[in-house]
Amino acid sequence: MGVEIERRFLIDGREEKPWRTSDFVDIFQCYLSGVRYHDGEIMWNGVTLARDEIAPTNITTWRMRVVDNGVVLTAKGKRVGAMAEEFEWDIPIELFNSLPTSDLPSIKKRRYNWNGADGLLWEVDEFEDSLAGLIIAEVELDSVDQSVDLPPWLGMELTNLRGWSNASLSMMIKDSRLD
């Protein structure tokens, strides 16, 4: 278990995009409901996804993230300002591919890793498909009061705003398809 401390910002993509000279990965994320913990097993849809001796508690979001051929199951606790508890487990790609994920809330994005003037790593996500054109940048911090040199291309800060998490965005997409 760890504590994630991050700040998130909208980006106006009509301006220069200096992050595009950086390395990137393509990411697929889907969000699960009904995840259960029983006798050391984290289960969803009758399938054991991971094992852990300690039961994750107060979890608000369960996510599976696919990058290349790696899959990480993440459990996130309730966000309080810029902080949230976070648990992660690697799961085999074969297991992920066997799961019924096509109807789950999901997002696709390209993530660029850009180094700021202060040496902090910014993750700049350019969303795809239904969210094409949306760009969000986030920076992980060691403490909530850590000083950050904000790049000039950042827009509105989203850190404390509800509805801007990737999980919320994925639900918005899923809900819009139910018409």
Give short role names for the model-derived ranges.
Residues M1-D179:
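Phosphate-end processing signature that detects enzymes handling 5′-triphosphorylated RNA
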